C-alpha cells in the first residue's frame, strides 16, 4: 500500500476541465488571429498612436532637448568624496601584518601534549609564516 496521497477527482470534473482548457486554447488562438488581421486591415500598424501622430505633425517636446545641460542637476564631482577621504577606514589594512594575538591557534587535538616549549614555538612560527600574506 503506501501509494501516497491521491486526490479523488470525479470523472465528470476531469472531462469538464479538459473541455475548459480546450475552449481557452481555441479562444486564445482565435483572438491572436483576429488581432493580427486587424493590424493588416489598417495598413500602418502603429499609425494611430499618439506618438506617431506627434512625430508626423512635427510637435517638438522641449522637455528632452538635446542641448540640455545635464551636469547642472548633479552635485559637483569634486564635492562627492572630500568628506569621506578624511575619515579612517575601520576595516582590515592589508598592508600591515596582523598582530600575533589575532592569529588563530591550532586546535588542541592537533598538538601533542608532550611537546616542549621550543617545539610549540616552532609550530607557531610555521603557522604564522603560512598565514602571512605576501604583497
From Swiss-Prot:
Main location as per UniProt: nucleus
Key words, A-Z: Activator, Cytoplasm, Nonsense-mediated mRNA decay, Nucleus, Transcription, Transcription regulation
Compositional bias ranges of the Polar residues kind: 13-23
Pfam families: PNRC
UniProt subcellular location: Nucleus; Cytoplasm, P-body
Motif SH3-binding in this chain: 95-101
GO biological process, one term: nuclear-transcribed mRNA catabolic process, nonsense-mediated decay
InterPro entries (UniProt xref): PNRC-like_rgn, PNRC1/2
Domain of life: Eukaryota
GO CC annotation, single: P-body
Region (Disordered): 1-46
Function, in words: Involved in nonsense-mediated mRNA decay (NMD) by acting as a bridge between the mRNA decapping complex and the NMD machinery. May act by targeting the NMD machinery to the P-body and recruiting the decapping machinery to aberrant mRNAs. Required for upf1/rent1 localization to the P-body. Also acts as a nuclear receptor coactivator.
Family note: Belongs to the PNRC family. PNRC2 subfamily.
Protein name: Proline-rich nuclear receptor coactivator 2 A
Lineage of origin: Eukaryota, Metazoa, Chordata, Craniata, Vertebrata
Amino acid at each position: 500500500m503506501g501509494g501516497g496521497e491521491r486526490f479523488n477527482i470525479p470523472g465528470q470534473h476531469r472531462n469538464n476541465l479538459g473541455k475548459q482548457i480546450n475552449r481557452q486554447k481555441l479562444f486564445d488562438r482565435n483572438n491572436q488571429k483576429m488581432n493580427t488581421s486587424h493590424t493588416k486591415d489598417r495598413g500602418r500598424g502603429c499609425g494611430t498612436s499618439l506618438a506617431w501622430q506627434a512625430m508626423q505633425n512635427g510637435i517638438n517636446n522641449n522637455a528632452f532637448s538635446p542641448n540640455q545641460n545635464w551636469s547642472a542637476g548633479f552635485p559637483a564631482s569634486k564635492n562627492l568624496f572630500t568628506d569621506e577621504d578624511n575619515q579612517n577606514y575601520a576595516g582590515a589594512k592589508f598592508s600591515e601584518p596582523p598582530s600575533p594575538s589575532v592569529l588563530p591557534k591550532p586546535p588542541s587535538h592537533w598538538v601533542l601534549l608532550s611537546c616542549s616549549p621550543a617545539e610549540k614555538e616552532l609550530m607557531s612560527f610555521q603557522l604564522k609564516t603560512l598565514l602571512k600574506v605576501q604583497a
